[in-house]
């Protein structure tokens, strides 16, 4: 059986680690969001009756924004792993390069 090069093994290990971290984080987020999603669902007809009410403070308390601080951390870790993988692949390619001809040939 042929062994994998070091960069390929490192890429595979980093990819598996990131995938397991991502699945664990998404499972935790979905379990915490499922209980909060059922709480505040008013009837659409009642919102039309309240024309002069400012809903921004209530929306700020009830609705989560797009990405919380853990999401930014996960994105930063994901991108850094991606760039590290690309760097390792480039280093692996550079290590495998061989010159086509010797440097000290007569012109």
Swiss-Prot record:
Q: How does it sit in the membrane?
A: Single-pass type I membrane protein
Q: What does UniProt give as the signal peptide span?
A: 1-27
- Report the transmembrane regions from the record: 71-91
Instruction: Return the GO cellular component terms, semicolon-separated.
Output: membrane
Keywords annotated in UniProt: Membrane, Signal, Transmembrane, Transmembrane helix
Which residues point to the Cytoplasmic side?
Answer: 92-107
Q: Name one Pfam family in it.
A: TMEM213
InterPro entries the UniProt entry points to: TMEM213
* Topology, Extracellular side: 28-70
Broad class of the protein's primary localization: membrane
Spell out the subcellular localization from the entry. Answer: Membrane
Q: Which PANTHER family match?
A: TRANSMEMBRANE PROTEIN 213 (PTHR36293:SF1)
List the protein's name: Transmembrane protein 213
Tell me which species this is from: Homo sapiens
Organism taxonomic ancestry: Eukaryota, Metazoa, Chordata, Craniata, Vertebrata
Gene name, please? TMEM213
């Amino acid at each position: 059986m042929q062994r994998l090069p070091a960069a390929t093994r490192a890429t595979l290990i980093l990819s598996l680690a990131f995938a397991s971290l991502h699945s664990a984080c998404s499972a935790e987020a979905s379990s915490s969001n499922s209980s909060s999603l059922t709480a505040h669902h008013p009837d659409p007809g009642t919102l039309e009756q309240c024309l002069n009410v400012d809903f921004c403070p209530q929306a700020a308390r009830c609705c989560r924004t797009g990405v919380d601080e853990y999401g930014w951390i996960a994105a930063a870790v994901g991108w850094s792993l991606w760039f590290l993988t690309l760097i390792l692949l480039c280093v692996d390619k550079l290590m495998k390069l061989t010159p086509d001809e010797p440097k000290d040939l007569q012109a």
